UniProtKB/Swiss-Prot annotation:
Belongs to the DMRL synthase family. The keyword DNA-binding does not apply. SUPFAM superfamilies: Lumazine synthase. The active site is at residue 87. This is 6,7-dimethyl-8-ribityllumazine synthase.
Length: 154
């Protein structure tokens, strides 16, 4: 048997956790996510936005929200651009691990953190050549929220 979730957001409650660091990118990712959620039937009143200082703080809030079981999915959005030090590697790795761990609470937690080598690459992923990764994360959230509900009924 194959199971595939529908891509309709009607009736879903979604949390979006966004890093303020590199806000010129993360603002666009958030706009892309909200636009995509609304286009797929999630009403504005069912979308809650939580702002955190940076990508490193995303897992903490995502975990708290996932544990509450108030949301059908949690989307994490951030942007980490490589600099001249190893800080990039630590932030990317720990954010990814923490976000993945947040999904262990039974609520889908979506990784929408853009990690790039340059500002130009980040801009491309926030709505130009490479699409909007916030919108892509929203699609994943809708699909995973619906798939999670399907699995609960098995």
């Amino acid at each position: 048997m194959n199971y595939s979730a529908k891509l309709t957001g009607e009736g879903l409650k979604i949390a979006v956790v966004t890093s303020r660091f590199n806000h010129f990118i993360t603002d666009r990712l958030t706009e892309g996510a909200i636009d995509t959620l609304e286009r797929h039937g999630v009403v504005k009143e069912d979308i809650d936005i939580f702002l955190v200082p940076g990508a490193f703080e995303l897992p903490f809030v995502a975990s708290k929200l996932a544990q509450k079981k108030k949301y059908d999915a949690v989307i994490t959005l951030g942007c980490v651009i490589r600099g001249a030090t190893t800080h990039y590697d630590y932030v990317c790795n720990e954010a990814a691990k923490g976000i993945a761990k947040a999904g262990e609470y039974g609520t889908p937690v979506i990784f929408g953190v853009v990690t790039t080598e340059s500002i130009e690459q980040a801009i491309e992923r926030a709505g130009t050549k490479a699409g909007n990764k916030g919108g892509e994360a929203a699609i994943s959230a809708i699909e995973m929220a619906n798939l999670n509900k399907m699995m609960d009924e098995l």
